[in-house]
Amino acid sequence: MARITVQDAVEKVGNIFDLILVAARRARQMQIGGKETLITKNNNDKYTVLALREIEEDLITKK
């Protein structure tokens, strides 16, 4: 199971509500196949976890 702390991602985006919107939008993009993941997928991580990791690594921004 993937363990991820949301606090780092919240600091990158601004607040928890925007984080939810950005992560959900990014997860949906990956799920429907429109956009590839920007990081290597490990351990069958779900798209929401991948989206949060991309945000933490500054690969995805709020805009």
Swiss-Prot record:
Reaction it catalyzes: RNA(n) + a ribonucleoside 5'-triphosphate = RNA(n+1) + diphosphate
Keyword terms, alphabetized: DNA-directed RNA polymerase, Nucleotidyltransferase, Transcription, Transferase
Single Gene Ontology BP annotation: DNA-templated transcription
Q: Which GO terms describe its molecular function?
A: DNA binding; DNA-directed RNA polymerase activity
Name the enzyme's class.
transferase
The entry assigns this protein to a family as follows:
Belongs to the RNA polymerase subunit omega family.
Q: Which PANTHER family match?
A: DNA-DIRECTED RNA POLYMERASE SUBUNIT OMEGA
Report the function annotation for this chain. Promotes RNA polymerase assembly. Latches the N- and C-terminal regions of the beta' subunit thereby facilitating its interaction with the beta and alpha subunits.
The name under which this protein is listed is DNA-directed RNA polymerase subunit omega
What would be the name of the gene that encodes this protein?
Answer: rpoZ
